[in-house]
Amino acid sequence: MRILIFGINYSPELTGIGKYTGEMGAWFAAQGHDVAVVTAKPYYPEWKIHQAYKGTGWTTEKIAGVTVYRVPLYVPKRVTAKKRILHEFSFLAGVSPKWFGLLLKKRYDIVINITPPFHLGFFAASYAKLRGAKLITHIQDLQVDAAKELGMINNKKALDLLFKAEKYLLDKSHAVSSISLGMKKKILAKGVPESKYVMFPNWVDEDVIKPLTREDSLRNEWGIPMEDRVVLYSGNLGEKQGLEIIINAAERFRDRPNVHFIICGSGGARDRLKDMADRAGLRQVQFYPLQPYEKLPALLATADVHLVLQKKSASDLVMPSKLTGILAAGGCAIVSAVPGTSLHDIMYMHQLGILIEPESAEALATGLQQALNEDLTPFRERARQYAERFLSKDQLLKEFERHLVKLTTYEKQT
């Protein structure tokens, strides 16, 4: 098949949507498909264009057999709701000339639109209509719902317009996929028939991310004694994620210097969180940059306890991608989730970690006390078993490929 992917994030971004889209593109190319991607300069999660891509306009490169068309965009130094809108629309403006160029090239069989941003779908839908391709919309985050529930957009007319635009794009899609059951319910409630829906969860390469010993972790590199306890948060440090509770909870462990809080990543809240820890005199709270993929197994093995923290308003609109790696590494996570959401249900049903109330430093401190004072081996064993059974990269991508083949009635050569 010839597959064209539209998405604002792609490799070499190490985390978030770009990681998964990049791995998907590379996997399809490895199966012999002709794959191209229209994407932005890499900028996430640092919100800073990577050095190797600075000062360039529209470029083309090959990554793991995939033709990658990069377009310029505006990346704000400080992310606000208004600046994020400008950021996304600047990307759409950059896509326009490349879109026209693609219309003149050999037709693609499948167009995959990765959302957010959801309005990128207008380019994908238009291409599919004009060239007779099949369109699949893959939803990593219900962006308009999130903007409403997080209070980022409060104007009713604007929200109505956005929901109508979203419905139009969903109606034009030949298939719609998402990453969790909670998102599926919301998507079906928008009028998408179940026959068009495809479950396509985020995955993990369980052959790469696997349990390691403490001796194989980053403890020696970071000067952390093997007998000490480590609480790890790794990922995007966004302003709206409520990560202050990590610092607040760490204050409860001030008199336990053998308990280390490691915050690994970048984002708009990093400097503020570091300032909070410094002002509180919390020397056991340490900050490190996001680690490269090849160090991820060692990073995950460093922790006794992992933190997966979400705000209440996130509910089932997003599914934390960091959890897949934690489970594959056989890690025990403290997860903040609202009862009834997919995240809560999965964690509870399979007993994969410790569930706490979101946005509560008290609940986090209590969960940490529990985690640091009991044998976590059963949690770790169940986590790895779950990853092997439900999150296998090869298994999930093969299943998704089968859906694409059905859409195009393409007989894959074996």
Model-flagged regions — what are they?
Residues 100, 119-122, 126-130, 157-176:
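Membrane-proximal helix-turn-helix segments that form the acceptor-binding/catalytic region
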Residues 182, 203:
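Carbohydrate-associated surface elements
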Residues 1-64, 414:
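N-terminal subdomain of nucleotide-sugar transferases
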Residues 359, 363, 377-405:
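A charged, aromatic-enriched C-terminal amphipathic alpha-helix characteristic of glycosyltransferases
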Residues 241, 289-298, 306-327, 333-345:
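Nucleotide-sugar-dependent
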Residues 51-58, 210-224, 380:
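A short helix/loop element that forms part of the nucleotide-sugar donor recognition site in Leloir-type
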Residues 262-265, 270-297:
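Nucleotide-activated donor-binding/catalytic signature segment of Leloir-type glycosyltransferases, i.e.
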Residues 225-241, 247-250, 262:
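Conserved donor-binding/catalytic core segment of Leloir-type glycosyltransferases
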